[in-house]
Amino acid sequence: SGLIIDVRNNGGGNVTNSERIAARFTNEKVLTGYIRHKTGKGHNDFSEPYSIELEPSNSIRWQKKTVVLTNRRSYSATNDFVNQMSCLPNVTIMGDKTGGGSGMPFTSELPNGWTVRFSASPHFNADMEQIEWGIEPDIKVNMDETDETKHIDTIIEKARAFLKGEWTPAASE
């Protein structure tokens, strides 16, 4: 048994909330990544990386197997949540690569009325790999066309089978 968290098609939200949720899945402090801040006008004017650590919640924590479902429409604070969860030993990320972005967007209007929005602070995972362009899942699973015509969610069904120990990625190859 286990838990499935489906963040597919989630455009983001509040980074603080993603941290509060992820904190329910660890009993100890975990390094989840790094962030750099802009320090000047130059293209490469950024601070040294600051570590980001996930502190365990002071409330109820879930320590059983967990699968987080992702796709290319998982953005911003959702991307941060997936990154945090990917650092936890009882969590498996399944589905497709996330859409990327960080939870710290900068938005401004140009003189012509166009709106510009971009990540103000580059985020990296615990291995110092850029996550702004998305996070690959631990297990890639695509929707099956036959299942889709029958209104069956292939990805959820694979996650259920994985949690029950009835399916492994190697067994399907």
Segments (PLM) and residue ranges:
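Extracytoplasmic/secreted envelope proteins and their assembly/folding machinery
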Residues: 18-22, 66, 78-82, 152-160
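Extended C-terminal subregions enriched in glycine
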Residues: 65-87, 92-99
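Sec-exported extracytoplasmic/periplasmic mature domains
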Residues: 1, 23-30, 86-90, 160-168
